[in-house]
């Protein structure tokens, strides 16, 4: 029987975490019984009522060109092997109808999302082949600019999208792939919204009005996104949720840079985070802080345009009592306590992103027919 309040989450970094932990060797991590070294495993997905998951096939920005493409293919290969290993628990999905079928069968619909335009190596042909392999969203940038789009966390070069970047958006519309605007600069957000003819997603972002982080979404963009049918999937990462943690994280980035590191790269920043967690810990972040963002997006964009994108296994720490993928019911219960109806919670949990996915598919079919 389908869980009426199952979660369709927009972003989970288990593939890269498995690469780092054990070189993708499924026998070296116990995802079936429970894997305490990770924030994601099969028992906790079930506890968290996760019925559909966009698995991020992220690769670091230090990989460019063919190296980025190869690493992305390895990430895709891992997800497909993961699903094949646990095919009684997981099911590959490339359409909204596939998601429905997986959920009805009691399996987690498993979708692929690329995180950063560097994964296509500047090639529309590569973008098309990634679609053929099952990728259904691409985040236009990660933490660094690509030649055709500015990142939110890099020095702006283009002031938005280049002509090629607009062509990428149009090709994604034609293919039936979500344009994901997490990580991009506000100018890229606005250019993409001006260009797209299909709904966009923010796969893991929060509201800039509540937490002034470069990674978050301004209110005017939230409103424009909603007019086009898009969905902002609220993330749980404390430095994007809580202003005090965002300020603490900015200090960590300054320390990283002061030591000669690159503030855009996790490999340089993470050791500083680990050190300062011990010596100068961040303020507490709670489920109520996350709920505030869900409510703000609902207020600005509307209840039909908010979703969830936890970013588990993609961040070093999470709000109190929200440390892994079993935590979604806590957030849903918190929002219910604030007066959200079951209908509104269902839209937040999965209904909105499924509706947007169907609209993206319809745009693709319409353009193909034309």
Give the location of each predicted region.
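Active-site glycine-rich loop that binds ribose-phosphate moieties when present
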Residues: 159-172
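Extended hydrophobic secondary-structure segments
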Residues: 17-18, 172-192, 304-315
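Histidine-centered catalytic micro-motifs
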Residues: 7-14, 184, 202-206
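N-terminal hydrophobic targeting/anchoring segments and the immediately downstream early-domain regions
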Residues: 1-161, 212-370
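Substrate-binding cleft of carbohydrate-active enzyme catalytic domains
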Residues: 170-181, 188, 219-227, 296
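Acidic, glycine-rich loop-and-beta core segments that form the ion-binding/anion-interacting portion
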Residues: 186, 194-229
């Amino acid at each position: 029987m389908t869980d009426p309040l199952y979660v369709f989450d927009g972003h989970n970094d288990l593939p890269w975490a498995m690469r780092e932990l054990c070189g993708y060797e499924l026998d070296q991590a116990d995802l079936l019984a429970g894997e305490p070294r990770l924030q994601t495993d099969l028992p906790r997905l079930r506890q968290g009522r996760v019925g559909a998951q966009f698995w991020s096939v992220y690769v670091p920005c230090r990989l460019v060109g063919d190296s980025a493409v190869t690493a992305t293919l390895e990430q895709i290969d891992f997800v497909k092997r993961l699903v094949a290993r646990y095919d009684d628990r997981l099911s590959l999905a490339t359409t909204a109808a596939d998601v429905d079928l997986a959920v009805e069968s009691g399996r987690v619909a498993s979708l692929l999302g690329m995180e950063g335009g560097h994964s296509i190596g500047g090639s529309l042909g590569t973008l098309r082949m990634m679609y053929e392999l099952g990728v259904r969203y691409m985040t236009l940038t990660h933490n660094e600019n690509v030649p055709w789009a500015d990142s939110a966390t890099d020095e702006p070069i283009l002031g938005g999208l280049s002509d090629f970047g607009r062509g990428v958006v149009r090709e994604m519309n034609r293919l039936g792939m979500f344009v994901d605007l997490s990580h991009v600069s506000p100018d890229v957000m606005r250019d993409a919204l001006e260009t797209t003819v299909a709904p966009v997603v923010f796969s893991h972002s929060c509201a800039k009005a509540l937490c002034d982080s470069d990674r978050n979404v301004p209110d005017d963009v939230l409103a424009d996104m909603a007019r086009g049918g898009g969905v902002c999937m609220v993330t749980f990462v404390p430095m994007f949720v809580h202003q005090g943690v965002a300020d603490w994280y900015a200090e960590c980035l300054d320390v990283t840079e002061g030591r000669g590191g690159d503030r855009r790269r996790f490999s340089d920043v993470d050791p500083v985070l680990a050190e300062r967690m011990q010596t100068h810990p961040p303020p507490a972040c709670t489920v109520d802080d996350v709920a505030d963002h869900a409510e703000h997006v609902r207020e600005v964009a509307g209840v039909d345009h908010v979703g969830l994108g936890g970013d588990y296994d993609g961040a070093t720490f999470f709000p109190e009592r929200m440390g892994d993928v079993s935590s979604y019911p806590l957030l849903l219960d918190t929002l219910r306590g604030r007066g959200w109806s079951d209908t509104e919670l269902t839209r937040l949990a999965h209904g909105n992103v499924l509706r947007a996915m169907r609209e993206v598919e319809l745009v693709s079919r319409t353009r193909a027919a034309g």
